[in-house]
Amino acid sequence: MGSQSETVCVTGASGFIGSWLVMRLLERRLTVRATVRDPTNVKKVKHLLDLPKAETHLTLWKADLADEGSFDEAIKGCTGVFHVATPMDFESKDPENEVIKPTIEGMLGIMKSCAAAKTVRRLVFTSSAGTVNIQEHQLPVYDESCWSDMEFCRAKKMTAWMYFVSKTLAEQAAWKYAKENNIDFITIIPTLVVGPFIMSSMPPSLITALSPITGNEAHYSIIRQGQFVHLDDLCNAHIYLFENPKAEGRYICSSHDCIILDLAKMLREKYPEYNIPTEFKGVDENLKSVCFSSKKLTDLGFEFKYSLEDMFTGAVDTCRAKGLLRPSHEKPVDGKT
């Protein structure tokens, strides 16, 4: 797998993960078909067209998860498909119809396109940590056998609940379809993705990751006992699992875990110019971190390259350079939230 003459398709190619993955695939001289909802929207696709080798090895294809069959042409003739696209509207007034249903139907639509193409050797799906550990009481360690509690999600309606439900139900539906239709299917389960990026707007995962800096308290619950992976490690893992013939099933991709207190301490030391809290409601130093085990991935031979500090330095530097994060805040009176 992974020869330079191969053609692969990346869905959601203009997004945070998709665009970085396209960049890494182009560096390996693969021909990439990138699907986006509107290839004529220059603001949304310029960062893709500006990539090295884009002129010779990249084409943009119009496709939408809500439009069944719209991925058929882009996938036809490809040997690999990376399904990264997913609706990310956390503020949706109608999450069942605007987020959950389109995610599941879009996933199955991609799989039908792969089956119809008859050229796709492997489909790699970007799942989410939200498919694994959303439940009332956290375990100390999670692995690929764990699944989130959908009833708890729908009852609790925590920040991003509709995203967790949509990814879980989509992945479960995909495994059923893959087994019934003999599709070589791999899922990657990233934890919170952090790092530098090439898209022009603020990635949703960085709204969460950088919430101690921005003071966006609604997102603190997600990183109260957080797990993290560098965007570049994640994209390299996608390619590694596509190319490795021994890969099968689900793979957690997570390199670091820490509680929000320790993350805030690291960020305060690194960025004293920001108003970063010293205390968080309901959190003290006795709170245990929760681990997402990447043992299955590393046992296959994959190696993580980046530290937690690398992730956040890359994210903050990029946000500042793009004008998405103010260079400093005035100090608060008490440093608490």
UniProtKB/Swiss-Prot annotation:
It catalyses: a (2R,3S,4S)-leucoanthocyanidin + NADP(+) = a (2R,3R)-dihydroflavonol + NADPH + H(+); (2S)-flavan-4-ol + NADP(+) = (2S)-flavanone + NADPH + H(+). Pathway: Pigment biosynthesis; anthocyanin biosynthesis. It is an enzyme of class 1 (oxidoreductase). The active site is at 167 (proton donor). It comes from the Eukaryota. GO terms for molecular function: dihydrokaempferol 4-reductase activity; flavanone 4-reductase activity. Its EC number is 1.1.1.219, 1.1.1.234. InterPro entries: Epimerase_deHydtase (IPR001509), NAD(P)-bd_dom_sf (IPR036291), NAD(P)_dehydrat-like (IPR050425). GO terms for biological process: anthocyanin-containing compound biosynthetic process. NADP(+) binds at residues 12-18, 37, 44, 64-65, 84-86, 163, 167, 190-193, 205. Substrate binds at residues 128, 133, 163, 204, 208, 227. Induction: By light. Keywords: Flavonoid biosynthesis, NADP, Oxidoreductase. It holds the Pfam family Epimerase. Belongs to the NAD(P)-dependent epimerase/dehydratase family. Dihydroflavonol-4-reductase subfamily. Bifunctional enzyme involved in flavonoid metabolism. PANTHER family: NAD DEPENDENT EPIMERASE/DEHYDRATASE, STEROL-4-ALPHA-CARBOXYLATE 3-DEHYDROGENASE, DECARBOXYLATING. This is Dihydroflavonol 4-reductase. It comes from Vitis vinifera (Grape).
